[in-house]
Amino acid sequence: AGDAMQPTSLLLSLRDAGFEMNDDLTKLYLDYCKERSTISMNSQDWTLPEPTRAAYTDDMLNTATAFSDTAVVVIGRSGGENADLPTDMNAVIHGTYDVAKTDVVDTKYKGNYGYTAGTYTNNGDYDDFEPGEHYLELSRTEEDLVDMVCSNFRNVIVVINANNAMELDWVDKYDNIGAVLLVPGTGTTGMTALGKILSGAVNPSGKTVDTYLKDLTKAPTYNHSGNSGNHIYTETDDLVKKVGRNDLSFQGVFTFTDYVEGIYMGYKFYETAAEEGLIDYNEYVQYPFGYGLSYTSFTQKITDFKQNDDSLTVEVTVKNTGDVEGKD
């Protein structure tokens, strides 16, 4: 736990690391969204505040590109306990998102949004998401932002500030995106590391703890997890009344998830399915479990292998083959 009300900001992290930033762009972002949308146990505003393409004038872009040929794009997502990520953002926008499927729930619960009601406010005069697009995809406004930045800056760094594994297939569409940094929940002081990493003072050594897919909707768990796979508890009338009296955000539905996949989730499914010829691994997986780059390179060599009944022991020698210190 930490004091989330006074965290180290991204701007402070960059300044402390010696970076200078474009004042016009900084002011644009700070003025556009002085207060962030809230996603909590009792309130779920899934809005992704982002200035539209029209907010970036020609003069602003000309000044920015003259200032530097390098740009940092930050994409953020939230979510957490009692805030399962929506699988149809367009429906959230229009207030019709119904996680209580009509074929598995009594009609008196139809239309309820899980435990709490969810909302979304568009950034422009268009819908940020098309029907069926989920929360871990880029919004239309974010797509416009990435395209604009990559069309104007030679070097682009993408920072993903999200605890959940987003769809990042769009990264491969732009040759000038030279780096993607995964920066999940930073707590009070975690963001201080970002500036140090970007400046080269610190060599990153983190690895992905999830499998990053090119299309999350093709994951076996997609239709059985979170709001998309909710089953509804029955015989809960007494509990519904008690909770409803104490929690005004309660919508009258208690849900659960059926873990039908067993152990075959994440890398266990994709590596097994590829080995058995069910899928082409590279068509599904963008970044595998345990993936991560640094400012140096390594080689690994198995130097010993032992099997003892039902246990295996493998010894690996790791060698830094690059020019700077690092960890692997």
Residue ranges and their predicted role:
Residues 1-328:
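C-terminal non-catalytic regions of proteins with extracellular/luminal or membrane-system context
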